[in-house]
């Protein structure tokens, strides 16, 4: 019985020794792995300046209960993405506004001042009017041949006809105003204004009796 008890103690001690050796080997492997990982992190931080400082600041903020390097105000990729999206949106707006600006500039260059271009040939020029007045003063008549005026003024016939119609209407108005209004109620041959009126009809220039 004593031999069996001693053999059990020996086996227990051997098992404990094996466990301790395996645990020590595992600890050694873990320390080597962590050391290799820290060396890689240090090399990466040296290759990218400023990363280590950012990492330490982030760890300190997380420990102190801060927001860390995540969120809209973080200086990491999220913040840069917002800036990039803002610049892209601004570029799209500028591209949309540029064709409109070019169109307005072309319109302004084609029609300066936003004024409508006058129709050509709508009115006589000042020198043409002076020329007509001088011709009428020399001839002292409205019966000047229109073909001669067309040839002298180098103008179309319709424009000269319209101008003569306006001048004749103005001359008739001035003649009527200068003629005295007759003081009678029926047309007579003595009235210069109503000689063409039939006998017994009212004169167009007659005034009412009452």
UniProtKB/Swiss-Prot annotation:
Localization in the cell: Nucleus
Gene Ontology cellular component annotations, sorted alphabetically: chromatin; cytoplasm; nucleus
Main subcellular location: nucleus
Record-level GO BP terms: ectopic germ cell programmed cell death; flagellated sperm motility; negative regulation of transcription by RNA polymerase II; positive regulation of DNA-templated transcription
Residue ranges the UniProt entry marks as DNA-binding: 117-175
UniProt KW keywords: Differentiation, DNA-binding, Homeobox, Nucleus
Inducing factors: Expression in embryonic stem cells (ESCs) is dependent on DNMT3L, which mnaintains a low DNA methylation on promoters, allowing its expression.
Segments of skewed composition (Basic and acidic residues): 17-30
Disulfide-linked positions: none
SMART domains in the record: HOX
Compositional bias annotation for Gly residues: 47-79
Protein name, UniProt field: Homeobox protein Rhox5
Organism: Mus musculus
Organism ancestry: Eukaryota, Metazoa, Chordata, Craniata, Vertebrata
């Amino acid at each position: 019985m004593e031999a069996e008890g001693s053999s059990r103690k020996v086996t227990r001690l051997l098992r404990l020794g094996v466990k301790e050796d395996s645990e020590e080997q595992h600890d050694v492997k873990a320390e080597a792995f962590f050391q290799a990982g820290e060396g890689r992190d240090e090399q990466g931080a040296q290759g990218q300046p400023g990363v280590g400082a950012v990492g330490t600041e982030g760890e300190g903020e997380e420990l102190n209960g801060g927001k860390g390097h995540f969120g809209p105000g973080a200086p990491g990729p999220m913040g840069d993405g917002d800036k990039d999206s803002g610049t892209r949106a601004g570029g799209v707006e500028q591209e949309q506004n540029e064709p409109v600006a070019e169109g307005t500039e072309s319109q302004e260059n084609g029609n300066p001042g936003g004024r409508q271009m006058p129709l050509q040939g709508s009115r006589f020029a000042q020198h043409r009017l002076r020329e007509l007045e001088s011709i009428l003063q020399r001839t002292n008549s409205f019966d000047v041949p229109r073909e001669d005026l067309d040839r002298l003024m180098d103008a179309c016939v319709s424009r000269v006809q319209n101008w003569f119609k306006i001048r004749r209407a103005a001359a008739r108005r001035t003649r009527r105003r200068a003629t005295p209004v007759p003081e009678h109620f029926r047309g007579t041959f003595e009235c210069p204004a109503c000689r063409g009126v039939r006998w017994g009809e009212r004169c167009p220039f007659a005034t009412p009796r009452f």
